[in-house]
Protein backbone atom coordinates (compact mmCIF):
# COMPACT_ATOMS: atom_id res chain seq x y z
CA UNK A 1 0.00 0.00 0.00
CA UNK A 2 1.43 3.38 -0.95
CA UNK A 3 0.07 6.89 -0.38
CA UNK A 4 -0.26 9.10 -3.43
CA UNK A 5 -0.52 12.88 -3.73
CA UNK A 6 -3.61 14.71 -2.47
CA UNK A 7 -4.31 11.87 -0.03
CA UNK A 8 -5.19 9.45 -2.81
CA UNK A 9 -4.25 5.95 -1.79
CA UNK A 10 -3.22 3.26 -4.21
CA UNK A 11 -3.93 -0.25 -3.01
CA UNK A 12 -1.27 -2.79 -3.85
CA UNK A 13 -1.88 -6.45 -3.15
CA UNK A 14 0.36 -8.32 -0.74
CA UNK A 15 1.20 -10.74 -3.56
CA UNK A 16 2.42 -7.81 -5.66
CA UNK A 17 4.43 -6.42 -2.75
CA UNK A 18 6.09 -9.79 -2.21
CA UNK A 19 6.82 -10.50 -5.87
CA UNK A 20 8.11 -6.98 -6.54
CA UNK A 21 10.35 -7.16 -3.47
CA UNK A 22 11.68 -10.53 -4.59
CA UNK A 23 12.44 -9.28 -8.11
CA UNK A 24 14.17 -6.14 -6.82
CA UNK A 25 16.38 -8.12 -4.45
CA UNK A 26 17.39 -10.61 -7.14
CA UNK A 27 18.06 -7.78 -9.60
CA UNK A 28 20.42 -6.23 -7.04
CA UNK A 29 22.43 -9.41 -6.47
CA UNK A 30 20.45 -11.49 -4.00
CA UNK A 31 20.18 -15.22 -4.60
CA UNK A 32 16.64 -16.38 -5.36
CA UNK A 33 16.24 -18.69 -2.34
CA UNK A 34 17.41 -15.92 0.01
CA UNK A 35 15.18 -13.29 -1.62
CA UNK A 36 12.16 -15.53 -0.93
CA UNK A 37 12.65 -15.18 2.84
CA UNK A 38 13.26 -11.43 2.78
CA UNK A 39 10.31 -10.79 0.45
CA UNK A 40 8.05 -12.78 2.77
CA UNK A 41 9.18 -10.69 5.75
CA UNK A 42 8.40 -7.50 3.81
CA UNK A 43 4.96 -8.89 2.93
CA UNK A 44 4.21 -9.77 6.57
CA UNK A 45 5.35 -6.35 7.78
CA UNK A 46 3.11 -4.62 5.23
CA UNK A 47 0.17 -6.90 6.10
CA UNK A 48 0.55 -5.82 9.73
CA UNK A 49 0.71 -2.14 8.80
CA UNK A 50 4.37 -2.02 9.86
CA UNK A 51 5.55 -0.01 6.87
CA UNK A 52 8.90 0.94 8.40
CA UNK A 53 9.87 -2.76 8.34
CA UNK A 54 8.21 -3.36 4.98
CA UNK A 55 8.69 -1.61 1.66
CA UNK A 56 10.39 1.29 3.39
CA UNK A 57 13.46 -0.94 3.80
CA UNK A 58 13.55 -2.28 0.24
CA UNK A 59 15.65 0.54 -1.20
CA UNK A 60 18.15 0.17 1.64
CA UNK A 61 18.36 -3.59 1.11
CA UNK A 62 19.02 -3.11 -2.61
CA UNK A 63 21.64 -0.42 -2.06
CA UNK A 64 23.43 -2.54 0.52
CA UNK A 65 23.40 -5.58 -1.76
CA UNK A 66 25.06 -3.45 -4.45
CA UNK A 67 27.73 -2.09 -2.09
CA UNK A 68 28.44 -5.47 -0.50
CA UNK A 69 27.31 -4.49 2.99
CA UNK A 70 24.85 -7.39 2.73
CA UNK A 71 26.00 -10.62 1.11
CA UNK A 72 23.05 -11.90 -0.90
CA UNK A 73 24.81 -15.10 -1.97
CA UNK A 74 25.87 -16.65 1.32
CA UNK A 75 24.85 -19.88 3.04
CA UNK A 76 24.32 -19.52 6.79
CA UNK A 77 26.12 -22.02 9.02
CA UNK A 78 23.93 -23.72 11.63
CA UNK A 79 25.52 -25.26 14.74
CA UNK A 80 23.84 -27.43 17.35
CA UNK A 81 26.59 -27.67 19.95
CA UNK A 82 24.56 -28.95 22.90
CA UNK A 83 20.96 -29.80 23.78
CA UNK A 84 18.68 -26.78 23.90
CA UNK A 85 20.91 -24.45 21.89
CA UNK A 86 21.12 -23.60 18.22
CA UNK A 87 23.45 -21.03 16.67
CA UNK A 88 23.47 -19.73 13.13
CA UNK A 89 26.23 -17.63 11.63
CA UNK A 90 24.56 -15.54 8.95
CA UNK A 91 27.96 -14.72 7.43
CA UNK A 92 26.94 -11.08 6.85
CA UNK A 93 23.83 -12.00 4.91
CA UNK A 94 20.16 -11.42 5.66
CA UNK A 95 18.78 -12.28 9.10
CA UNK A 96 15.68 -13.78 7.48
CA UNK A 97 17.56 -16.47 5.57
CA UNK A 98 19.82 -17.24 8.54
CA UNK A 99 16.75 -17.66 10.74
CA UNK A 100 15.07 -19.87 8.13
CA UNK A 101 18.12 -22.16 8.07
CA UNK A 102 18.13 -22.53 11.86
CA UNK A 103 14.40 -22.53 12.56
CA UNK A 104 13.69 -26.27 12.03
CA UNK A 105 16.63 -27.13 14.30
CA UNK A 106 15.39 -24.74 16.99
CA UNK A 107 11.84 -26.12 16.86
CA UNK A 108 13.11 -29.70 17.09
CA UNK A 109 15.42 -28.76 19.97
CA UNK A 110 12.63 -27.00 21.87
CA UNK A 111 10.36 -30.01 21.47
CA UNK A 112 13.07 -32.46 22.52
CA UNK A 113 14.43 -30.42 25.44
CA UNK A 114 11.49 -28.30 26.56
CA UNK A 115 13.38 -25.12 25.70
CA UNK A 116 15.79 -23.83 23.09
CA UNK A 117 17.94 -20.75 22.81
CA UNK A 118 18.52 -19.69 19.20
CA UNK A 119 21.32 -17.24 18.45
CA UNK A 120 21.30 -15.57 15.02
CA UNK A 121 24.72 -13.99 14.53
CA UNK A 122 26.54 -11.82 11.98
CA UNK A 123 23.53 -10.71 9.94
CA UNK A 124 22.04 -7.54 8.57
CA UNK A 125 19.15 -5.93 10.47
CA UNK A 126 16.24 -8.21 11.21
CA UNK A 127 13.72 -5.33 10.91
CA UNK A 128 10.59 -6.64 12.69
CA UNK A 129 11.67 -8.98 15.46
CA UNK A 130 8.07 -10.16 15.82
CA UNK A 131 8.31 -11.75 12.37
CA UNK A 132 10.60 -14.36 13.90
CA UNK A 133 8.87 -14.94 17.24
CA UNK A 134 5.50 -15.36 15.49
CA UNK A 135 6.91 -18.32 13.57
CA UNK A 136 7.57 -20.12 16.85
CA UNK A 137 4.01 -19.36 18.01
CA UNK A 138 2.62 -20.89 14.81
CA UNK A 139 4.50 -24.07 15.79
CA UNK A 140 2.76 -24.05 19.18
CA UNK A 141 5.80 -22.68 21.01
CA UNK A 142 6.34 -19.52 23.02
CA UNK A 143 8.71 -17.21 21.15
CA UNK A 144 10.72 -14.56 22.99
CA UNK A 145 13.22 -12.55 20.99
CA UNK A 146 15.79 -9.88 21.77
CA UNK A 147 18.30 -8.02 19.65
CA UNK A 148 21.45 -6.09 20.18
CA UNK A 149 21.42 -2.81 18.31
CA UNK A 150 22.80 0.69 18.42
CA UNK A 151 21.19 2.47 21.39
CA UNK A 152 18.51 4.87 20.13
CA UNK A 153 15.76 4.71 22.78
CA UNK A 154 15.65 5.45 26.50
CA UNK A 155 13.63 2.91 28.52
CA UNK A 156 10.51 4.06 30.41
CA UNK A 157 11.63 6.47 33.11
CA UNK A 158 15.11 6.72 31.61
CA UNK A 159 16.83 9.69 30.05
CA UNK A 160 19.69 7.97 28.21
CA UNK A 161 19.35 5.83 25.10
CA UNK A 162 20.28 2.25 25.95
CA UNK A 163 17.94 0.22 23.70
CA UNK A 164 17.75 -0.28 19.97
CA UNK A 165 14.49 0.51 18.19
CA UNK A 166 13.33 -3.12 18.21
CA UNK A 167 14.72 -4.59 21.42
CA UNK A 168 12.17 -7.27 22.39
CA UNK A 169 9.34 -9.33 20.93
CA UNK A 170 7.15 -12.11 22.25
CA UNK A 171 4.61 -14.34 20.55
CA UNK A 172 2.28 -16.81 22.22
CA UNK A 173 0.44 -19.64 20.45
CA UNK A 174 -3.28 -18.94 20.04
CA UNK A 175 -4.29 -22.57 20.43
CA UNK A 176 -5.31 -23.05 16.82
Predicted regions and their residues:
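Generic N-terminal amphipathic, Lys/Arg-enriched alpha-helix
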Residues: 4-28
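Phosphate/diphosphate-binding glycine-rich loops and adjacent basic-rich segments that engage nucleotide
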Residues: 153-176
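N-terminal glycine-rich anion-binding loops that anchor highly charged ligand groups
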Residues: 10-14, 30-56, 70-81
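Active-site cofactor/substrate anionic-group-binding motifs, chiefly glycine-
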Residues: 54-107
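General beta-strand structural signal in soluble alpha/beta enzymes
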Residues: 88-90, 111, 117-122, 143-147, ...
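A glycine- and small-aliphatic-rich helix-loop capping segment at beta-alpha/alpha-beta transitions
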Residues: 67-69, 133-143, 159-166
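Alpha/propeptide regions of enzymes that mature by internal proteolysis
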Residues: 40-43, 96-98, 102-121, 128
Amino acid sequence: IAAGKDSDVTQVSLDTIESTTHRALVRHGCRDDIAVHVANAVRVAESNGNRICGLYYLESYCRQLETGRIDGDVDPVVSVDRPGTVRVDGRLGFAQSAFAAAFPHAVASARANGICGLSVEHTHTCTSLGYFTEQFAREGLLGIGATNATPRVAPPGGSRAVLGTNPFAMAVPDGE
